[in-house]
Amino acid sequence: MSNDYPLVSIIIPTYNSSDYITETLTKLEKQTYPNFEIVIVNDGSKDNTSNVLREYGLTHSRLIIINKENGGVSSARNTGIRKAQGQFICFMDDDDEIDPNYLLKMYTRQHETGGDAIYCGLYGHYIKDGVTYSPINTEFNEGSLLFDFFYKKVRFHIG
């Protein structure tokens, strides 16, 4: 079945994520899309991230682990791109959580439109002192995406 779907490379730069990276990867493994690899780039972590990733990788064949000197998130993403084998590339952060149908929906949309880049809305939250905050909630709008692109409207740090 997975041969019917092109390989998607999910690139995750990480730094000092030993406390939560296993949870991120475990949730990511629940994707309904059958053909993906996870390229995780450990960007010179000073904590136990390298050992946590190595242990996780022993039982998860989708995981490709790259350890490099710290160079920042953009350098880590570029390293991941160079190692990726997929026809499509998807970026995530090391603390992101995505819907189990995310890759399948993105692939379906790309297949329907033939688009070179596929974009979706974003919802984010964080927990501080036991209170959940939801500061990010953007719905996808094709018209505003084009506007944002041409006016270089950047909503988030991208490297």
Language-model regions, residue ranges each:
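Nucleotide-sugar donor-binding/catalytic module of glycosyltransferases
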Residues: 1-159
